[in-house]
Regions:
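Short, glycine/charge-rich beta-strand/loop segments that flank catalytic centers
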Residues: 62-63, 98-102, 127, 139-143
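A generic local structural motif
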Residues: 2-6, 84, 128-129, 165-167
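Short, function-defining helix-loop hinge/capping sites that tune catalysis or transport
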Residues: 29, 72, 109-112, 133
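Glycine-rich nucleophile elbow surrounding the catalytic serine of serine-hydrolase chemistry
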Residues: 100-108, 113-114
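Alpha/beta catalytic cores of group-transfer enzymes, especially the acyltransferase/condensing modules
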Residues: 23-24, 49-51, 111-199
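Helix-rich "cap/lid" substructures immediately adjacent to catalytic or cofactor-binding pockets
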Residues: 4-98, 180
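Hydrophobic side chains within alpha-helical segments
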Residues: 75, 82, 107-109, 121, ...
Length: 199
């Protein structure tokens, strides 16, 4: 097990923290860090008490970890646990806080705009609503890399017009990286066309 040496932190004047969105979860995450910092499990206990189920158990066992209603509160709690470890170690206070999708809630908690307890309740509800909106396996998302945004939109329109189900550009992550979302068959069809077009 390796210990964290806070003396190696860069003393930057402009630091930003960007909290991750869904998809960054892994069974057993933060287990090693929890052995070094009691605040990790304390953060999970605080969030678990607010939400009414054991988030640490889900993170460590993987039971339900890929169900959105559980994934989101676990990831939010993990982000805040890491944030608190950073502060405990005397890490530089960031000038900017941001988050990608679900990570926006982590940024709000870190900024003191939202309590962890309220935030885990919100993201649990958010996850339930997302899960209910599309039955398991009926919908999908995928990142298309290496194509112009307009080409991705064109491919989505082409597939949707062929009645393979609806698919749309859902998120423009960066130049040449567009996330698409829609019916599973339609997303797969766009992915296939994207590969044919050099994506």
């Amino acid at each position: 097990m390796s210990m964290i040496d806070s003396s190696k932190f860069v003393k930057a004047t402009k630091t930003a923290f960007v909290f991750p969105g869904q998809g960054s979860q892994k069974v057993g995450m933060l287990a090693e860090l929890a052995e070094q910092f009691s605040g990790v499990k304390e953060t999970f206990a605080e969030a678990s008490e607010a939400i009414g189920f054991d988030l640490w158990h889900i993170a460590q066992s993987g039971e339900g970890l890929n169900q959105t209603e559980f994934t989101q509160p676990v990831l939010l709690t993990a982000s805040i646990a890491l944030w608190r470890v950073w502060l405990e170690l005397g890490g530089v206070a960031p000038k900017y806080l941001a988050g990608h999708s679900l990570g926006e809630y982590g940024a709000l908690v870190a900024a003191g705009s939202l309590s962890l307890g309220d935030a885990v309740k919100l993201v649990n509800l958010r996850g339930k609503l997302m899960q209910d909106a599309v039955p398991q396996g009926a919908g999908a998302m995928a990142a298309i890399l290496g194509l112009d945004d307009a080409k991705v939109v064109e491919l989505c329109q082409q597939v949707t017009a062929q009645e393979n189900g609806s698919v749309e550009a859902a998120n423009y992550n960066a130049q040449g990286q567009v996330v698409i979302a829609g019916a599973t068959a339609a997303v797969e069809a766009v992915m296939s066309l994207a590969k044919e077009n050099g994506g």
